[in-house]
A protein has these predicted regions:
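Flexible phosphate/Mg2+-sensing switch loops adjacent to catalytic phosphate-binding sites
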Residues: 135-168
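Gly/Thr-rich phosphate-binding beta-strand-loop-beta motif of the actin/hexokinase/Hsp70
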Residues: 109-136
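Short secondary-structure boundary/capping segments
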Residues: 134-138, 144-145, 276-287
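Acidic/polar, low-complexity linker and loop regions
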Residues: 67-111, 289-290
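Short, solvent-exposed secondary-structure capping/transition elements
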Residues: 129, 136-141, 256-257
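Conserved phosphate-binding loops in N-terminal lobes of ATP-dependent enzymes
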Residues: 1-55, 162-283
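Active-site neighborhood for divalent-cation/phosphate handling
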Residues: 127, 267-269, 290
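Charged, low-complexity interaction regions that mediate assembly/partner binding
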Residues: 49-76
Length: 290
């Protein structure tokens, strides 16, 4: 067979990506791409290619289900290397066990320019997020059919009882506002082996577990609940960053005016000035970053 003719090779895996929108000029791109497979002998790598055919290498790669020996912590859960990509790109190149493939995202997003305002109540037990567009009514933060933030290469994977829990526990929700909705428990789900003195990234290291209570947490994750008062600053920042990524994605997907997006957050009068200073500093940093 002439190698130039190509071939069809069957591989058992899927890939998710969010957000599936190109970032406007002046906004720092921030994508999450995840490869998921139940196969033990797959060597998988990806990179992204820009419009000028130059290659974008991921900034970070981490698999929450992989231990220091390179073995899966939870045998029934997939290996799931997740990548951070911080540049716009056109398509993805994928290599599995020496076989190359190209994946072209179906980019979404809308033209617009509407002004969005969000209100975040970071509570001790529950966290609630509402928003309004322009002078419209306020409603709980949602992800609708028209503006789904996450793309899945093989939607049948969303029916796989071994793969689906990892997607629901460690990534943004496919939809938000019906089966799951705000307010939600104030929890951070994170890789148990995390060293919080090292750099961390939302959804790579940890995130708000949107399906908490309806999906069993993965064994390789731990839960932190006392975020508002006694948790390390890095944990609080990771939790809030997982929410602010949802907010930014929503504005971009719906064609909103990102530079003029407003975020209001609340705090109790009983909060000490020291703790208020920490929370305020985290919000200011996240608003600047995103």
């Amino acid at each position: 067979m002439n190698p130039k003719d190509g071939a069809i090779i069957q591989m058992s895996f899927t890939m998710t990506m969010f957000p599936c929108v190109k970032f406007p000029q002046g906004t720092k791109p921030d994508y999450r791409l995840t490869l998921l497979t139940l196969e033990d002998d797959y060597q998988m790598e990806l990179s992204c290619v820009k419009e000028d055919n130059s290659t974008v290498q991921p900034t970070v790669k981490m698999d929450r289900n992989m231990n220091s020996a390179g073995e899966r912590e939870e045998i029934l859960a997939p290996s799931q290397p997740m990548y951070v990509v911080e540049e716009n790109f056109e398509f993805i190149t994928l290599n599995i066990n020496g076989y190359d493939a190209i994946i072209v995202p179906k980019w979404r997003g809308s033209a617009g320019g509407s002004t969005y305002e969000f209100a975040v109540d970071f509570g001790t037990t529950n966290t609630h997020v509402e928003y309004k567009v322009g002078s419209g009514p306020s409603k709980a933060l949602d992800i609708t059919n028209e503006h789904i933030q996450m793309s899945c290469l093989n939607v049948d994977a969303l029916k796989n009882t071994n793969i689906l829990p990892s997607i629901r526990n460690n990534q943004i929700p496919y939809k938000l506002g019906v089966d799951i909705k705000f307010p939600m428990r104030t929890l951070l789900s994170y890789k148990t082996a995390t060293d919080w003195n090292q750099p961390f990234w939302p959804y790579i290291t940890g995130n708000m577990p949107f399906y908490y209570g309806s999906v069993v947490n993965n064994k390789f994750n731990s839960l932190e609940s006392d975020l508002k008062w006694n948790s390390p600053e890095q944990m609080v920042k990771c939790f809030l960053a997982s929410i602010i990524m949802l907010i930014r994605n929503k504005v971009l997907m719906e064609g909103g005016d990102l530079p003029n997006t407003r975020i209001v957050w609340f705090y109790p009068t009983s909060m000490s000035m020291h703790q208020l200073g920490i929370i305020s500093g985290i919000w200011n940093q996240l608003y600047s970053d995103y």
